[in-house]
């Protein structure tokens, strides 16, 4: 799009349905049939509308109700994400592999109206069915419904998403995000696009962005919103063990990574196995700090390394580093013109801006 839209309503009605309906929105590979499925933006928009009909017709007074997603990455995950939001629900992406103690704590806190699940057993299926069986629904429930004829804008500053922290300092906290918070992170994608503009052949199809990080991870969640709002294709992976097969079947130039994945890419590059990575040349780091030497090695071997710093509480839009040189590649990067920064006497970096969360759910002192 010519500018990064600020609402999901515009992203769907203007972007997906009018500006780039014939572009590829998603690809995913199915190993059992050895096929790559392609979904266009106009098809995605119709399925989002089906989900709106589905949720609004099966959940009384749906506005503000919590819809939990417990599933591996899939096209249905994407559809339910956008559909729940446009239905006026509060979306709660959850880590399906957490212990039952952690998961039950989060579910009790959220009090969901529905839990959408892929039906697989991640170690807690029996407990989940016993405690919440009446709320469990399949991920593809939307398919038998007609697309909603009308969509309506949601409250720009209303609670839209609850995303749980990793819980490194105890039980996870629910980070409250509004539409303003999440879509304000669009300036990060614009900054990345500007850095890549002179390096991409615009006569060819738009570069594919590969996603294998789970969608309950902030890095993947921001990718989902950013690429679809911009009209870029997203190649979906659901298991890191299928990484090499996925990127050969679905050529991808860009990929968001955490340190473990960056280190694995680094080993391939340094051992002369760059060909295993296909077209991949832009790893975008999010999460913890990366080893500067690893990043420098990648940059010296044709990779363009990007680092994004900013926890879930800032929608990943806190600080970005495009540096490829030895002096600066180990830094966190530069601040954004869209944010205010302050360093406290004890060294803590404080940030203020539209991307900063609304607060912690049911924990105002957190």
Stretch-by-stretch model annotation:
Residues 21-24, 146-164, 170-171, 199-208:
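Conserved pre-ATP/AMP-binding loop-to-beta segment of ANL
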Residues 253-257, 266-327, 340:
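Gly/Ser/Thr-rich phosphate-binding loop
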Residues 35-39, 52-98:
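Conserved AMP-binding/adenylate-forming
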Residues 183-208, 212-272:
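Conserved AMP-binding/adenylation subdomain of ANL enzymes
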Residues 1-58, 63, 108:
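N-lobe entry segment of adenylate-forming
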């Amino acid at each position: 799009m010519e500018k990064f839209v600020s609402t999901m309503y515009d992203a769907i009605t203007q972007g997906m349905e009018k500006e780039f309906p014939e572009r590829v929105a998603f690809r995913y590979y199915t190993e059992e049939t050895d096929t790559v499925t392609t979904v266009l933006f106009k098809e995605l928009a119709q399925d989002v509308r089906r989900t709106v009909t589905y949720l609004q017709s099966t959940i009384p007074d749906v506005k503000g109700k919590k819809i939990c997603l417990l599933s591996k990455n899939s096209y249905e995950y994407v559809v339910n994400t956008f559909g729940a939001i446009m239905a006026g629900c509060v979306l709660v992406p959850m880590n399906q592999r957490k212990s039952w103690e952690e998961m039950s704590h989060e579910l009790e806190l959220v009090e969901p109206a529905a839990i959408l699940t892929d039906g697989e057993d991640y170690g807690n299926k029996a407990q989940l069915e016993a405690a919440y069986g009446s709320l469990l629904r399949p991920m593809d429930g939307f398919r038998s419904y007609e697309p909603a004829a009308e969509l309506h804008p949601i409250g720009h500053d209303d609670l839209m998403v609850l995303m749980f922290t990793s819980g490194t300092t105890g039980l996870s906290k629910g980070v409250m995000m509004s539409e303003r918070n999440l879509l304000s992170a669009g300036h990060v994608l614009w900054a990345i696009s500007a850095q890549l503009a002179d390096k991409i052949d615009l006569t060819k199809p738009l570069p594919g962005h590969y996603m294998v990080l789970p969608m309950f991870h902030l890095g993947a969640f921001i990718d989902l919103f950013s690429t679809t709002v911009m009209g870029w294709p997203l190649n979906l992976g659901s298991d890191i063990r299928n990484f090499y097969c996925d990127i050969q079947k679905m050529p991808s130039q860009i990929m968001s990574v955490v340190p473990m994945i960056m280190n694995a890419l680094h080993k391939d590059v340094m051992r002369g196995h760059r060909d295993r990575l296909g077209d991949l040349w832009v790893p975008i780091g999010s999460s913890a700090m990366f080893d500067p030497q690893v990043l420098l090695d990648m940059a010296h071997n044709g990779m363009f390394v990007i680092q994004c710093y900013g926890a879930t509480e800032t929608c990943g839009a806190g600080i970005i580093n495009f540096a490829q040189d030895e002096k600066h590649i180990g830094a966190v990067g530069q601040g954004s013109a869209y944010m205010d920064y302050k360093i406290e006497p004890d060294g803590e970096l404080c940030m203020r801006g539209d991307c900063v969360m609304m607060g912690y759910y049911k924990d105002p002192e957190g």
